[in-house]
Amino acid sequence: DAKAVIIYGQEGDNTSNMRMEGYEKACTEAGVEVLAKLSGNNLTDGATKAMEDLLSAYPDQIDIVLCHNDDTAIGAMNACKSAGVSDITIVGFDGNASAVKLILDGELVKATVAQQPYEMGYQVVEAAVKAVKLEPVDEVINAPVQVVTAENGQAYLDNLEAMKG
């Protein structure tokens, strides 16, 4: 069975807490054991330190590193490379171009989960118009995400560039 560690954002942050709950539930459903969770404080350097600590605590045991954002994924990758660890899969979140480029270069960051800001903005305006018209507005509005990997990374980057105009 696969074993994972989670490098999360900041203690007490609602978004970070909800993301953590989702990661843990998905791991449980997939039969992945979560060995530990450490904060990277949403920073590359913080995640590098967290990953160094995790590699020390769990030598040769970590298969997957789940990160709450792409900066922490890059920090985790830096720590793994410094320690000579290459048989590990790191997953980020946000779909930053820098992380996608690492994925395309075959680095340890293998995927990132990209939010869809255009769709999110569109749905916010739709909800605002409904509210102004005194129509019912959904309490929760879910926006899609896209998993970006080596297979679709270049198309994702091309789309990002096209959206810049």
Regions found by a protein language model. Give the residues of each.
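A conserved helix-loop-strand patch within extracytoplasmic ligand-binding domains
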Residues: 1-5
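Hinge/cleft segment of the Venus flytrap/periplasmic-binding protein
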Residues: 7-11, 15, 25-27, 116-165
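Conserved donor sugar-nucleotide recognition element shared by glycan-biosynthetic enzymes
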Residues: 15-19, 43, 47, 121
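Ligand-binding cleft/hinge of the Venus flytrap
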Residues: 20-31
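Hydrophobic alpha-helical
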Residues: 22-23, 35-36, 40-102
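Structural signal for short hydrophobic segments within the conserved structured cores
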Residues: 35-38, 111, 146
